[in-house]
Amino acid sequence: MKKYFFLMAAIVCCAITASAQDAQEDRNRTYRITLGNVQYAHHDEKMSAGEAVGKVLSGVLTGKTEVQATKYEEDVKNAIIKGLSSAHRYRYNDGLLQLDDIVEDGNLVADAVITNIQAKSDSRTWKDKDDKTQVTTTYKGIVEAMVTLKDAKTGEIVANPTFSGSGMGSSSYSDSDKAIRDAINRLSNRITEWLNKYCPLQANIIEGAAAKKDKQKEVYIDLGNSEGAYTGLHMGVYIVKTIAGREAKSQIGKLKIEAVEGDDISRCKVQSGGKDIKAAIDAGEQLLVISID
């Protein structure tokens, strides 16, 4: 009888361990993402001679011009692919797999409409030291796209974000090509950032490391090489509570991975919230760590 109870206890223990391991692996499960249709809204547009003259005259009068840069259509498509490929938890399907082979739960198909590929020029005149009139022209690139993300299994639209490769942080250049290529790179980065927020990496604080007085300086988290951790990754720290049967998260700090020390462990520097993080660890609070890059 004792042997029976010991055997049952061992089975239960193994089942609990396996379940915990499955949950650990499933929290950062990776998904496939496939690029479906890509359209350029201005693909078939052709400017008449009169329109071209009008653009030139407008530029002369105002010092500003705006022209669709249609020749960069393929570059923008490649930037969209790069953006989809660079996300933490998505693996880009490069066409080797048919759509029928990627219909597992969570996999996505992305259709894109490129709405704008534009170079804006701004000219100003000024006098040099010899009192000669000089003209300086600067260019700003703007690239915009709308991406429709659909569930690969059901075809249901799950998100419809719009991305822009310009904005307040965009740079001006003396060359239109450089301006547009900078905007294209920014577009790619925006797509990756959005996907990383939509489906972030998750971890738990497993131990407090260095501390000073009442502030936590370093912690260890259960995220390592096997789940895509890397040095420099920023992560938010959240207290998790259950309120009226619902999970509620409240951010109390921020971490930065200083060293990936194994398949499932990394050492992190506490960048903010050290006092609250230490208090939560000491109180045995449940802390969730979520990537914010």
Could you tell me what each predicted segment is?
Residues 19-87, 164, 199-205, 209-218, ...:
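A structural "domain/chain start" motif
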Residues 21-28, 152-231, 236, 242, ...:
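C-terminal/domain-edge helix-coil "capping" segments
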Residues 54-66, 124-135, 244-245:
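Flexible, solvent-exposed loop segments that connect beta-strands
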